[in-house]
A protein has these predicted regions:
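Intrinsic-disorder/low-complexity signal
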Residues: 1-755
């Protein structure tokens, strides 16, 4: 079990984990028949091996190779059901809305019971003669229930293989250390890897974890192993304690207030068809779920944590005020008032006394009063006391109090800020100071909203706004150069892979899906080979047979402003074909939907962009373990004439899995640029039962923001200039080599900003 967990983590970094000593690898060894057979199986799944891994495989037994094959098959979903509703769905069935309407009324009046000619299917639906061509379906064309499953997938149709490398115990420990030290919040893939690694390796002594959310995962591990006292070192403020308690209650490492979660539950379970709408019931159930109830052991643990905080009562109170309403509930539920009267809990008593008296003015209150009084000097002096808050309010402060004065004060404290914060300012400046741009935000509750521009922008001329953007960019580039120059290095040459110039730095773009076969950063561009892109959606793995309707769709935007959708309600669109709408899942093996895009047809029709989406039509969020992605090959990809299976793991270019903590009902997962023949991987959640509820203005805004962000390659060029490094033509000739494989670990990329 341990090795299987480590193998799954290694696959995310395009590697295979082997429990061997790399020093014992014999590079002269010839591959055994078992190794050659294993490599052939890897090719069927779209993978190849480099030379080091090939020789390393000779050191493991055939049984271990079989176990590795089983894990890779499971990750790629080879044993699941990939049949869809229509046989040979690349040829349209010719069904119409009239077929659905006639079938609806035929079932309404009794079907065969009243003498109508037709066929009654196992699901109970009556299909009148002359409507749906039943010989073309694997299930019911009216209610979407599948009757048959498939136990095969196509293999080996890929034109390009993904090379795997060797990972040993030392490599995985380095991954673990990079996650512990990550200066940016972990995305869903990193979080899943971290939880597995901390269970295997434990938490190192005297570890420093810079990210609060990562610290909560570590605290959870310590508490689960009865090490509550050791967890105290990671809980330095009352907010840290509240964050852990709320994570324990809800499963989210961010503090999401109860009213937000209740409103979110109502949105998730809203259904456009009234009888299926469960929004009110879901809201009541969420309210019950969030009720606080703790046993005595838990209460004493939290009381000790607060009592042992190194903060003064006034500092602790100010920290608690931001979530005062939640703290009032927690204090009552945890019986902290009772514990504060016990001997040894005097510090807890002082904190609660200061919290309830509210006698001391808060820092934020004083700052807001100075803002209201337009006291520029006081505002800037106070913001310099908290550089992080200064950075987050920099743009609004520039508009309100003037660019020059604000930037002069800001530049005095830039050396106290992490580079990732300055980088995010540089990436956001152009969009913020553009009066005509669409600004989008992605709340942690799983949807995307557009926000209005700052009204103060109208007070400045275009030249003034451009000057503000230039000043911000100049500030962060100079700061980055200064930070890189301050680093001691013995290197004289550097290699930067060309592909890194197409991958933006992931600061501010945290993925909520799990990537089991790679760790592509949001904004990564994938070139399209061949003339077809095949989208796929697989859901229902591990679930019993039940109605569960997930949908895959695409939105086609043409140069003339026209748009078309290819979805369950329109199976044939310009340059796109849908495999049929399934609304129920078979037992344990799931089911699948597909869309095939023809690039020649799209180009001929003048299509510019195609946006890929997945939605939960059923009440609730996207199903956990749902897998979505796309296939691509220079060679034609087959479609089964018997079951509609169109999945080939070797052709998968990118795929993601929905995590258990998913908070979205819809997901935009890619945009195809028809002219450039490339797909941009992005992740934009939204709340809607189908693609018609997606805000494509927000999608375009996100796409442009990703393309305008500083790329990894550009950041490395700044590093090379600051440290006077010359560019090397290959990794072997460089003192420092930054390859695509290195970029597969987002924590390593983020480490560049941890200065």
């Amino acid at each position: 079990m341990r090795d299987k967990k480590l193998l799954r983590i290694a696959l995310r970094y395009r590697a295979i984990y082997l429990d061997i000593d790399p020093k014992e690898i014999d590079l002269e060894t010839k591959p055994t028949p078992a190794v050659l057979a294993f490599v052939a199986r890897l090719r069927e799944n779209g993978f190849s091996v480099n030379e080091d891994l090939l020789h390393a495989l000779c050191m493991v037994s055939a049984t271990e190779l079989a176990d590795i094959t089983a894990v890779i098959d499971d990750v790629m979903g080879v044993k699941l059901n990939w049949a869809t509703l229509v046989k040979g769905w690349n040829v349209p069935t010719g069904k119409t809305r009239a077929d659905h309407l006639i079938t609806f009324f035929a079932n309404l009046i009794g079907g065969a019971k009243v003498g109508l000619e037709g066929c009654t299917l196992p699901c109970g639906c009556f299909i009148p003669e002359g409507t749906f061509p039943l010989e073309r379906y694997t299930g019911c064309p009216f209610c979407g229930t599948p009757f048959t499953t498939a136990n095969f997938v196509y293999k080996g149709q890929a034109s390009k293989l993904k090379e795997l490398r060797l990972f040993t115990e030392e490599d995985l420990k380095q991954v673990y250390q990079s996650l512990l030290a990550s200066p940016t919040p972990l995305d869903a893939t990193q979080k899943d890897s971290f939880e597995k690694l901390i269970d295997i390796y434990g938490l190192p002594d005297n570890v420093e974890i810079s990210m609060k959310e990562t610290a909560m995962l570590a605290v959870k591990h310590l508490v689960a192993n009865g090490q509550q006292a050791q967890a105290q070192a990671l809980l330095k403020t009352p907010t840290d304690i509240l964050r852990y308690l709320w994570y324990e209650k809800t499963g989210y490492v961010q503090i999401i207030e109860p009213r937000t979660l209740i409103a979110q539950a109502r949105r998730f379970y809203y259904h456009m068809f009234g009888p299926l709408n469960q929004s009110e019931y879901a809201g009541k159930e969420m309210k019950k779920k969030l009720k606080l109830k703790y046993d005595r052991k838990h209460c004493q643990c939290v009381a000790s944590w607060i009592n042992n905080l190194a903060l003064s009562p006034q500092q602790a109170t100010e920290n608690m005020n931001a979530k005062r309403g939640m703290w009032v509930r927690m204090i009552r539920a945890l019986r902290l008032g009772e514990y504060s009267r016990r001997k040894g809990y005097e510090h807890l008593a002082d904190i609660l006394d200061a919290f309830y008296r509210q006698e001391q003015p808060t820092w934020l209150g004083i700052l807001q009063q100075a803002r209201n009084n337009r006291d520029t000097q006081t505002v800037l002096q106070m913001l310099k006391q908290r550089p992080g808050l200064f950075a987050r309010s920099l743009f609004a402060t520039m508009l309100r109090f003037g660019c020059e004065e604000t930037m002069e004060a800001f530049e005095q404290v830039t050396d106290q800020m992490p580079s990732r914060l300055l980088l995010s300012l540089g990436n956001a400046a152009e969009k913020y100071f553009d009066p005509d741009a669409t600004r989008t935000v992605h709340p942690i509750t799983g949807y995307t909203i557009s926000i209005p521009k700052n009204k103060l922008l109208s007070l400045y001329s275009p030249a003034d706004l451009r000057a503000m953007v230039a000043r911000v960019k100049q500030c962060y580039i100079l700061s980055l150069k200064h930070s890189f120059a301050a680093q001691a290095t013995k290197a004289r040459t550097i290699y930067i892979a060309p592909s890194l110039f197409d991958i933006p730095i992931s600061v501010g773009d945290r993925s909520a899906t799990i990537q089991d076969t790679s760790c592509a950063l949001m904004g990564t561009r994938f070139p399209v080979e061949g003339d077809a892109v095949r989208l796929f959606l697989q859901w229902g793995k591990g679930l019993h047979a039940q109605p569960l309707d997930m949908d895959i769709s695409c939105h086609i935007a043409f140069e003339n402003g026209k748009t078309e959708d290819c979805a369950y309600y329109r199976l044939k669109a310009t340059g796109a074909k849908h495999g049929g709408d399934i609304r129920a899942i078979p037992d344990m093996v799931g089911t699948a939907e597909y869309i095939e895009l023809s690039l020649p047809e799209l180009a001929e029709a003048g299509a510019k962009y195609v946006t890929f989406t997945a939605n939960a039509y059923s009440c609730g969020a996207l199903s956990p373990n749902l897998v979505v992605g796309w296939m691509n090959s220079a060679y034609p990809m087959k479609v089964s004439e018997k079951t509609g299976v169109a999945y080939d793991p070797s052709c998968v270019q990118h795929m993601v899995r929905i995590s258990e903590s998913n908070l979205s009902r819809g997901l935009v997962f890619g945009v195809l640029d028809v002219d450039e023949r490339e797909i941009t991987w992005l992740e934009m959640p939204f709340i809607s039962q189908n693609i018609q509820g997606c805000d494509f203005t927000a999608v375009n805004a996100l796409l442009q923001r990703l393309r305008n962000k500083l790329s990894i390659g550009q950041l490395l060029e700044i590093k090379a200039e600051a440290q006077h490094l010359s560019l090397a033509p290959s990794p072997d000739e460089a003192d420092e080599a930054y390859t695509y494989e290195w970029a597969l670990n987002p924590a390593e990329v983020s480490a560049l900003l941890n200065m």
